[in-house]
């Protein structure tokens, strides 16, 4: 990614020179996207649709429904997630708030990723078992690996901005001492690595599964009902379309993984990722069953699965923006 996103010294110099607390496009997209996901998922928790069934089998979270009941645990999570989303968005005005929101998001996503190891049905027996994942909850939870990278990055970037930008800095143009933004910069670096390789892992895993008949059948409704890509089935067939996607996604994963040593590959890989998630997000508007029976904006499991792509699209845009020099 670019200096505007990843190098605090360069970014700070730009802020001091312009006299504005501006943000790189990538950071704005990441914060806005993650905030939207937490706000939406948090609101859904008050409808009785949520993660409580996943928590029951978790050694870390099973005490919540046991202590508060299913509805109480769902409402507790809803309040926590809504607060997280509000704090993330509040960071546009006051960075320290999104530093707190980012930390809360990272804590939440660490717990949800841990559910992959405790929830029955994560592995898909119809595709041969692990490492083949079921769509829900396996692939649904795997996406949180990428979202976790965003949360860590936002926490670090917000902490860095909150500590490094001051009226004195903007007036004098003198950069702050390293101590003032060192912690934030280190957390940002961890988050950046997590985003890049988390996204690469998702593409690699999802791409490999596209070669199975289970996955080809599973994604068929998304493709068949899409005005953008519905022609894939008539041209390539159900398995052929899935195989093509598998090749595309694995190639995307490889290009993202080699970003540090091949910047041009990063441009191509990030652009491929952006294209992928623009298409998958369009499925929210074309796929039957995206909303729950009570209707929009309450989403079904399929809808929530697709909504997470807002965050993954944010990573892709941030990587593309950064690989192009932050212009």
Task: List PLM regions with ranges.
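Membrane-interface extramembranous regions
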Residues: 2-327
């Amino acid at each position: 990614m670019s200096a505007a996103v990843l190098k605090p010294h360069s970014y700070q110099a730009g802020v001091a020179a312009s006299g504005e607390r501006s943000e790189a496009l990538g950071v704005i997209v990441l914060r806005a996207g993650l905030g939207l996901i937490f706000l939406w998922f948090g609101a859904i928790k008050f409808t009785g649709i949520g993660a409580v069934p996943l928590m029951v089998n978790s050694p870390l979270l099973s005490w919540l429904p046991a202590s508060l009941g299913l509805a109480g645990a769902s409402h507790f999570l809803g309040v926590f997630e809504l607060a997280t989303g509000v704090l993330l968005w509040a960071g546009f005005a006051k960075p320290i708030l999104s530093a707190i929101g980012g930390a809360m998001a990272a804590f939440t996503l660490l717990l949800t990723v841990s559910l992959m190891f405790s929830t029955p049905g994560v592995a898909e027996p119809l595709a041969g078992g692990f490492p083949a994942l079921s769509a829900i909850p396996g692939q649904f939870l795997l996406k949180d690996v990428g979202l976790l990278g965003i949360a860590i990055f936002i926490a670090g970037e917000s902490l860095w901005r909150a500590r490094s930008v001051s009226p004195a800095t903007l007036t004098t143009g003198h950069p702050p001492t390293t101590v003032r933004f060192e912690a934030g910069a280190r957390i940002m670096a961890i988050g950046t690595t997590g985003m890049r390789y988390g996204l690469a892992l998702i593409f690699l895993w999802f791409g490999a599964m596209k070669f199975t008949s289970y996955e080809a059948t599973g994604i068929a409704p998304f493709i068949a009902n899409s005005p953008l890509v519905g022609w894939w089935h008539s041209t390539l067939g159900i398995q052929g379309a899935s195989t093509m996607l598998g090749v595309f996604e694995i190639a995307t994963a490889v290009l993202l993984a080699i970003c540090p040593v091949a910047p041009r590959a990063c441009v191509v890989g990030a652009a491929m990722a952006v294209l992928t998630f623009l298409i998958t997000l369009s499925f929210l508007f074309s796929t039957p069953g995206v909303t729950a029976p009570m209707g929009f904006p309450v989403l079904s499991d399929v809808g929530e699965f697709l909504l997470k792509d807002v965050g993954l699209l944010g990573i892709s845009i941030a990587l593309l923006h950064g690989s192009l020099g932050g212009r």
